[in-house]
């Protein structure tokens, strides 16, 4: 099993959610986060003064999947989140040792 973590621009959340749903992904966790990468941040003008905004708003999506879904998930998320502009985001993949559905006690892939 894998844990796929995706950091994207907030306005792409619904596109990514719909794309994941279209391939049968039924559950995900979404968190509003702030961060920066190569994009660094940007300057904003407020009441005539320029301010530096170092952390940009992003959305983090966590989804637990079976190993055989990994390539399809990466492909569909990459396409759905793409704008071609700096700051499109990142996809991180980690091994999942165990998953337990608390209500039923189901474990591992049965709990996904």
From Swiss-Prot:
O-UMP-tyrosine modified-residue sites: 51
General function of this protein: Involved in the regulation of nitrogen metabolism. Regulates the activity of its targets by protein-protein interaction in response to the nitrogen status of the cell. Involved in the regulation of the ammonium transporter AmtB so as to optimize ammonium uptake under all growth conditions. In nitrogen-limited conditions, GlnK does not interact with AmtB, which remains active and imports ammonium. When extracellular ammonium increases, GlnK associates tightly with AmtB in the inner membrane, thereby inhibiting the transporter activity.
SUPFAM superfamilies registered for this protein in UniProt: GlnB-like
A Pfam short name: P-II
Residues where ATP binds: 37, 64, 87-90, 101-103
Primary localization class, coarse: cytoplasm
NCBIfam families: PRK10665.1
Name used for this protein in its record: Nitrogen regulatory protein GlnK
InterPro entries found in the cross-reference section: N-reg_PII, N-reg_PII-like_a/b, N-reg_PII/ATP_PRibTrfase_C, N-reg_PII_CS, N-reg_PII_urydylation_site
Regulation: Formation of the GlnK-AmtB complex is influenced by intracellular pools of the effector molecules ATP, ADP, Mg(2+) and 2-oxoglutarate. The rapid drop in the 2-oxoglutarate pool upon ammonium influx and a simultaneous, but transient, change in the ATP/ADP ratio promotes AmtB-GlnK complex formation. ADP orients the surface of GlnK for AmtB blockade. The GlnK-AmtB interaction is also controlled by the level of intracellular glutamine and the uridylylation status of GlnK.
Cellular component, GO, one term: plasma membrane
Classification of source organism: Bacteria, Pseudomonadati, Pseudomonadota, Gammaproteobacteria, Enterobacterales
PANTHER family in the cross-refs: NITROGEN REGULATORY PROTEIN GLNK, NITROGEN REGULATORY PROTEIN P-II
GO biological process, one term: positive regulation of nitrogen utilization
UniProt keyword annotations, A-Z: ATP-binding, Cell inner membrane, Cell membrane, Cytoplasm, Membrane, Nucleotide-binding, Phosphoprotein
Gene3D superfamilies per UniProt: 3.30.70.120
Post-translational events: Uridylylated/deuridylylated by GlnD. Fully uridylylated in nitrogen-limited conditions and deuridylylated when extracellular ammonium increases. Uridylylation abrogates binding to AmtB.
Subunit structure as annotated in this protein's UniProt entry: Homotrimer. In response to elevation of the extracellular ammonium concentration, interacts and forms a complex with AmtB. Binds to the cytoplasmic face of AmtB with a stoichiometry of AmtB(3):GlnK(3). Sequestration by AmtB is reversible. In nitrogen-poor medium, can form heterotrimers with GlnB (PII protein).
């Amino acid at each position: 099993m894998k844990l796929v973590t995706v950091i994207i621009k907030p306005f792409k959340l619904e596109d990514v959610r719909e794309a994941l749903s279209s391939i049968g992904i039924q559950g995900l966790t979404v968190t509003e986060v702030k961060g920066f990468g190569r994009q660094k941040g940007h300057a904003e003008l407020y009441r005539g003064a320029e301010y530096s905004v170092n952390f940009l708003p992003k959305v983090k999506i966590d989804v637990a999947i079976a190993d055989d879904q990994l390539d399809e998930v990466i492909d569909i998320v990459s396409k759905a989140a793409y704008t071609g502009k700096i700051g499109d985001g990142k996809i991180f993949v980690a091994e999942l040792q165990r998953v337990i559905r608390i209500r039923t006690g189901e474990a591992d892939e049965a709990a996904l």
